[in-house]
UniProtKB/Swiss-Prot annotation:
Belongs to the FMN-dependent alpha-hydroxy acid dehydrogenase family. FMN binds at P92, I93, A94, S121, Q143, T171, K239, S261, D294, G295, G296, V297, Q298, R318. The keyword Ribonucleoprotein does not apply. This is L-lactate oxidase. It catalyses: (S)-lactate + O2 = pyruvate + H2O2; 2-hydroxyoctanoate + O2 = 2-oxooctanoate + H2O2. The lineage of its organism: Bacteria, Bacillati, Bacillota, Bacilli, Lactobacillales. Its EC number is 1.1.3.-. The keyword Acetylation does not apply. It comes from the Bacteria. Homotetramer. One of its GO terms (molecular function) is (S)-2-hydroxy-acid oxidase activity. Catalyzes the oxidation of (S)-lactate (L-lactate) to pyruvate, with a reduction of O2 to H2O2. To a lesser extent is also able to use 2-hydroxyoctanoate as substrate. May be involved in the utilization of L-lactate as an energy source for growth. Coiled coil: none annotated.
Length: 368
């Protein structure tokens, strides 16, 4: 006899009409709690860097080619051996159940259905194993906030490796949280599970997620790269690189990838837009390791600009959270599909048949 029907782990799912990624924020605000929306949407301090992430794309101009014989552009690519339908990544975000009950499960399924890369935060609301079961072999990376407790770190690395993670993304720019005024005004404390921490401590649910960075090490150094690589046997990608010298130092210390990011403008306010730093960092990397980029991406043209300036994979954060809030995993897929549609149009109109063509596309900027 079949057991009683179990609760659907993906919760309520529905298709969403995506006009553009920017308009998703106002729609998501209507379905999210005030505190949850504030936590997801805000940047640190005055929000300059968060907004500059997007506006800086206006200072990058693509130089289209015509009569190139382009038809039905192919945006598929590979990253660290993983085949992807598009060079997109769900950037690591903490506690996705703030947006939707399915949390990382919905994010993973949406990414899998869209054929893009998924990454999971240390501070996820679902365990690595739970998320991996949904990913079911789809490309996946694990983002690590370096714990103070080395045994806990080993536990996370073991879980990630068993789950089939392609790489470990070590976040280096968030040894503590930026000052976020909406959280203060809303008296907001992050709700829900820190599933990976509870899995290590008790294996049970119910551990609150207050004091998000309490378990994280503040004094990070380059020696961690070889330590993590040696223990895990996985490639280590350093996230939060904003200076060319840091990229060079990380590669020299054994980093297998560089992740250009300012944490969505949620950490140090007053830093440049992430895209402004990408050309110099890409020049310093000089094709030695792959580059991931995130920061303010809201258009398919933004993706092409980042790729042309040196990125190999482009991360999207808040828009996927909003898609998840509005439609569960289907909303995540719909956001990805809309972005892929915009990428396809931009490739056709710039004369790019493949991602290799995009990488060779000429662009003009005011900062490179």
């Amino acid at each position: 006899m079949v057991d009683a029907v179990k609760a659907d782990p993906f919760g309520k799912v529905n298709a969403i009409d995506v006009l553009d990624l920017a308009s998703l924020e106002a729609r998501a605000e209507k379905v999210l709690g005030r505190g949850e929306f504030g936590y997801i949407s805000e940047g640190s301090d005055d929000g300059y860097t968060m907004h500059r992430n997007t506006t800086a794309f206006q200072d990058v101009h693509m130089l289209p080619r015509v009569l190139q014989g382009v038809e039905n552009p192919d945006q598929s690519t590979t990253f660290m051996g993983a085949k992807l339908a598009s060079p997109l990544l769900t950037a690591p975000i903490a506690s996705n159940t703030l947006a939707h009950p399915s949390g990382e499960l919905g994010l993973a399924k949406g990414a899998k259905e869209a054929g893009i890369m998924m990454s999971q935060s240390t501070f996820a609301s679902k365990t690595i194993a739970e998320t991996a079961a949904v990913s079911d072999g789809a490309p996946y990376m694990f983002q690590l906030y370096m714990p103070k407790d080395w045994e806990y770190c080993q536990y996370l690395l073991d879980e990630a490796k068993q789950a089939g993670a392609l790489a470990i993304i070590l976040t280096a720019d968030s040894t503590l949280g930026g000052y976020r005024e909406k959280d203060v005004m809303n008296h907001y404390h992050l709700k829900g599970r820190l599933a990976n921490l509870e899995g290590y401590n008790t294996g049970q649910s119910g551990v609150g997620a207050g004091g998000l960075f309490k378990e994280s090490m503040q004094k990070l150094d380059l020696g961690l790269i070889s330590k993590l690589a040696s223990y895990s046997g996985l490639p280590i990608i350093i996230k939060g690189i904003q200076h060319p010298a840091d990229a060079v130092a990380a590669i020299t210390a054994g980093a297998a990838g560089i992740y250009v990011s300012n944490h969505g403008g949620r950490q140090l306010d007053g830093a440049p837009g992430a895209i402004e730093q990408l050309p110099a960092i890409a020049a310093a990397v000089d094709h030695r390791v792959p580059i991931i980029f995130d920061g303010g991406v809201q258009r398919g043209t933004h993706v092409l600009k980042a790729l042309a300036l040196g990125a190999d994979l482009v991360g999207i954060g808040r828009p996927f959270s909003y898609g998840l809030a509005l439609g569960g995993w289907q909303g995540v897929k719909d956001v990805a599909d809309h972005l892929k549609m915009e990428i396809n149009i931009a490739m056709q109109l710039t004369g790019c048949q493949t991602m290799a063509d995009v990488k060779q596309m000429k662009v003009k900027t005011t900062f490179a």
